[in-house]
């Protein structure tokens, strides 16, 4: 069976090599179809005359040099009529007519320009009808090795079987993928080491607890604002539009105010605008005072509920509100002063009157120009009024019990310690002088009655009243 296959193979090769020249010329690579022949033939078998390519010389030299003199392992005749050629790297003849058709590297004596340390692959020629050839190399590296011929034409393949080609392709891809994964894994390991060291440094810091507490407060505020976002959307848009209107009003064209003061209408318009600015300034002052009172009330309520220091929570709010208030107030003041100076140009007044008017205006504008973030001394007026009302309602027993202190702290927004301290001070500063004054008035009336009725009964003065009178004397 093997002998028959060998005879068929060599007979088919004999038929091909003894055919006419046009069919065999397709066996020679060209620039238009350089991939139709990719086997490496010994250059010493090709003569300088290209017309002798169609004779028996090339076939006899090929059989003599390659097939008959090689070992049995170099000739592999298979059932699918594939013949493998194992050729060492040949030395090309000088100035061959086909030198321009082949890829040759003179420095390495390599026909196709391969690297010097690379080995030649086994090339197999397929005679007869075949499928389009698949190459184990990439198109970008060796585009001339790929052949896509029509049926019933001669086509050459780089491997003996499609499965071998696929296995080689998959092996190359797996090798490349493994190298890329190894490089990526080394980078990931280095990044993980740096991240773990940084996390250990953070968890070992002594400021970790404080930073976590501050971040928890900010997160709570963010959640609160997000929950109230839908409710405050309309209010924030209204405030933004109102602030834009104020800005446009303040940044109005000054040329309109300086030009054409001869007319009375423009002067009246400027005076009305100045009056409007003064009202706006007063409204800003009132709103700011109300906002600060509300902030202090919230501080007191928070301190009463949690017994924690609220300065951490209110510092940013007070500074932000104070900054916005000072900025808006300064702009309004500058606009009013500029309008006043422009109006003074159109009036026939003396220098003393104008200086006095500006001085009074500046004094009015600087009425609340102080450090806003300075802590307020004393308790809020609202809380003090609640405590004072309770003291007058319980005038005979002005010091509250523990349960009453708790209720008063909730109503006034203060802590229990603040309520206790206020009643201690109020009992000394308010209640005791009032009691002494009441007893003095009663004794005075009794003395007046004793002069009228000498034998009438006398009241005994309290010891505290007697001591206070002695101290006054």
Curated annotation (Swiss-Prot):
GO cellular component: nucleus
Feature: DNA-binding region: 372-434
PROSITE patterns hit by this protein: HOMEOBOX_1, HOMEOBOX_2
Cytoplasm among keywords: no
GO biological process: floral organ abscission; meristem maintenance; negative regulation of cell population proliferation; photomorphogenesis; regulation of gibberellin biosynthetic process; shoot organ boundary specification; vegetative to reproductive phase transition of meristem
Cystine residue pairs: none
GO molecular function: DNA binding; DNA-binding transcription factor activity; sequence-specific DNA binding
Region (SR/KY domain) residue spans: 205-221
Name this protein carries in UniProt: Homeobox protein ATH1
UniProt note: domains: The SR/KY and BELL domains are responsive for the interaction between the TALE/BELL proteins and the TALE/KNOX proteins.
């Amino acid at each position: 069976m093997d002998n028959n296959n060998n005879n068929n193979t060599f007979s088919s090769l004999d038929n091909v090599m003894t055919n006419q020249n046009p069919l065999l010329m397709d066996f020679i690579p060209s620039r238009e179809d350089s991939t139709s022949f990719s086997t490496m033939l010994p250059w010493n078998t090709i003569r300088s005359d290209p017309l002798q390519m169609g004779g028996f010389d090339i076939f006899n030299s090929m059989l003599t040099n390659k097939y008959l003199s090689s070992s049995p392992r170099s000739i592999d005749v298979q059932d699918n009529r594939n013949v493998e050629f194992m050729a060492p790297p040949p030395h090309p003849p000088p100035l061959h007519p086909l030198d321009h058709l082949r890829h040759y590297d003179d420095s390495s004596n390599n026909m196709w320009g391969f690297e010097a340390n690379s080995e030649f692959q086994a090339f197999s020629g397929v005679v007869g009808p075949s499928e389009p050839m698949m190459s184990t190399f990439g198109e970008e590296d060796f585009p001339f090795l790929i052949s896509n011929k029509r049926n019933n034409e001669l086509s050459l393949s780089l491997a003996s079987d499609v499965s071998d080609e696929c296995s080689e392709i998959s092996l190359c891809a797996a090798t490349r993928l493994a190298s890329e994964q190894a490089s990526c894994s080394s980078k990931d390991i280095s990044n993980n080491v740096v991240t773990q060291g940084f996390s250990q440094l953070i968890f070992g810091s002594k400021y970790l607890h404080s930073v976590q507490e501050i971040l928890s407060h900010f997160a709570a505020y963010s959640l609160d604002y997000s929950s109230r976002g839908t409710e405050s959307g309309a209010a924030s848009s209204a405030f933004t539009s109102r602030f834009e209107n104020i800005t446009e009003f303040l940044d109005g064209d000054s040329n309109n105010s300086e030009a054409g003061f001869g007319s009375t209408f423009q002067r009246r318009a400027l005076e009305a605008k100045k009056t409007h600015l003064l009202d706006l300034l007063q409204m800003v002052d009132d709103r700011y005072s109300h906002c600060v009172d509300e902030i202090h009330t919230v501080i007191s309520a928070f301190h009463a509920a949690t017994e924690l220091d609220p300065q951490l929570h209110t510092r940013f709010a007070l500074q932000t509100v104070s900054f916005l208030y000072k900025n808006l107030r300064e702009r309004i003041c500058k606009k009013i002063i500029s309008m006043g100076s422009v109006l003074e140009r159109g009036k026939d007044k003396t220098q003393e009157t104008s200086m006095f008017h500006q001085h009074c205006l500046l004094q009015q504008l600087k009425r609340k120009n102080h450090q806003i973030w300075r802590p307020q001394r004393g308790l809020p007026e609202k809380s003090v009024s609640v405590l004072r009302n309770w003291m007058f309602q319980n005038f005979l027993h002005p010091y509250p019990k523990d349960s009453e202190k708790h209720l008063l702290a909730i109503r006034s927004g203060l802590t229990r310690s603040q309520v206790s301290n206020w009643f201690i001070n109020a009992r000394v500063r308010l209640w005791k002088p009032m009691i002494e004054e009441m007893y003095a008035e009663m004794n005075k009336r009794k003395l007046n009655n004793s002069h009228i009725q000498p034998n009438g009964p006398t009241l005994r003065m309290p010891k505290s009243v007697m001591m206070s009178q002695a101290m006054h004397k």
